[in-house]
């Protein structure tokens, strides 16, 4: 049924459709409404066979099958919140032990059992991680950090020199009471490695010890693991090779920051585990992740033809759209399917928060190009300390704006769905994350792509490595002090990209007095390059 047809229904028919398509679970205080999406009741029967295969595939994954074929790895982030479902006692025991270690470490930091060199409590954490190793912890912080409780978190998630300088200098007043966390599965990823080296130099330049306040989250036996052990870092937590960065938030990557800000990590894990249980049901209509993935599939005709706009009506979920960008787009954005057919799949994700966005891009959503669906996220419970003033309750207005925007979009024929939680806490965030993780897994089965590899990301890393190698070759060539044109440099290095050489030298000449580019930049082919 088209969304325009839905809006034309009379009230009784709309209410009947709403009730037929509404999913709810009392134990989680959770509702999912897809009645304003392009989903028909008979879709449950029509999609039964393909979902039966998808459910079996997800069950096989949880049982330990090799899901990441490219790397020959299992995919086990679901085990992190319920070690009992892990495929071996060894894995189960290691997960349980790691949760206990993180809880104990967090408590020891917060209660002052572990202190800095002066016997004072730690006050801050400088977190170095890229992608999911940074976005997950940031989501945890934004969701649960409260003033005067726990440590203050600062994030370094890029190699922007200006950003590195600003963020390191911002912690200088509390440097003596700052912990440093470095997250890297392999220990060789350039961004966290460079961030670690800069942070380490900053600490040592200020005559302080690095290893006594440094913490690693990495795979056992990795370069970072070896370094942390050799230098006797404060602690090391495990990032198993069967956990991908974009699904690492229920492991040490998310649990450690949660523990350090005083959040309840067991409640967080239980919420995710409860949602996992709900989404193991092999019946589309009674499985919220299946309903969500079906709505995505029908909306974009199984080809990602519509973007996903994420609109949480809660400030603490403002970064959730960024978190979902990686989870959804890195998992589903694939050139080839599992049978090597070129499919160019994916769903684009963007968003911010309501009601702020009603004064921004919602104008286009209502009246512009119809190439999206909106995912509203609603929280019912409001904090008691915000009371009615002059006959106005902020929560009533927030809810009114959500309902009004929903209605306006539906009236305009724009598809939308709503996820509602009774309250927002560690449990509901865990459940929300698990819901999307499992919807992504099911959707990937529908379109026959591998949700657990990232060949495009790897291609970008390889290309960046080639550029760094080319820069070193350019620097070595110019060490003789001779003047050369860009074409002469290109020929000398047998390069296939004069443009790359130009871009490298333009950057070098701006940041070093040793390199000069003589001539008119509007005619780069005439420039004379030299090094003094």
Swiss-Prot record:
It is an enzyme of class 5 (isomerase). PROSITE patterns: P_GLUCOSE_ISOMERASE_2, P_GLUCOSE_ISOMERASE_3. GO terms for biological process: gluconeogenesis; glucose 6-phosphate metabolic process; glycolytic process. It holds the Pfam family PGI. Pathway: Carbohydrate biosynthesis; gluconeogenesis; Carbohydrate degradation; glycolysis; D-glyceraldehyde 3-phosphate and glycerone phosphate from D-glucose: step 2/4. PANTHER family: GLUCOSE-6-PHOSPHATE ISOMERASE. This is Glucose-6-phosphate isomerase. It comes from Prochlorococcus marinus (strain NATL1A).
